[in-house]
Amino acid sequence: MGGRAATALRSLLFWVDVAGPQGPFEPAFAAEHPIDPQVRVGHVHLRTADIDRVRAFYVDIMGFDVILEARDVPGWGTTGDILFLSAGGYHHHLGFNTWKSAGGPPQPDGVTGLHHVALNFSSRARLAQTVQRLVDAGVPLRQLSDHGTHLAVYLSDPDGNDLELAWDRPFEEWPVYGSAGAPAIDAPLDLDDLLAAA
């Protein structure tokens, strides 16, 4: 995918520039030896059963750019397919491989591992545009929530990896967790109201 669709996606997603403070929260427990406060999640790399299936979902429906796609690549003591995806030209925000998972089933409930990956959008309207494409493609939405700090739409990718598509409210609108006046952090989000912003 290229051209207008790729340009549109680059404007849809943003990856937080951590040059400044990220919000009003004080840590519940401050580490004795704190990590670099500028650290951020650079990318998430997931196992997939089928590169073509995951490519169709993340590129054709979600709108990510393909940075690298290769077959029969050596890795982790075996060979498999790889796919690196980006929004805006970064080396990759999402990576996928079949090194030890080709043809495998989704991870079952009741085991440890990744809970979900959150993708933050730059505006409510841009979140709504992507959710509209998912709805149009028949992708089931698992949960729609207003968490006070952000709006969230939860769904699963073709391998059963859970995704959260989110839009953060401005910091000054965030509730303070634990305060008497803080709203519920898992209030329902109306799909029609969200899609009206598209």
Q: Which residue stretches match the model-derived regions?
A:
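Acetyl-CoA-dependent GNAT
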Residues: N97-S101, D168
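Short beta-strand/turn micro-motifs at beta-sheet edges
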Residues: A30-H33, A102-Q107
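Vicinal oxygen chelate
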Residues: M1-I35, R40-A49, F84, P105-A198
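Short, charged/polar, Gly/Pro-enriched secondary-structure boundary elements
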Residues: Y90-G95, G104, D159-L163
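Core segments of cupin and vicinal oxygen chelate
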Residues: I35-V39, H45-T98
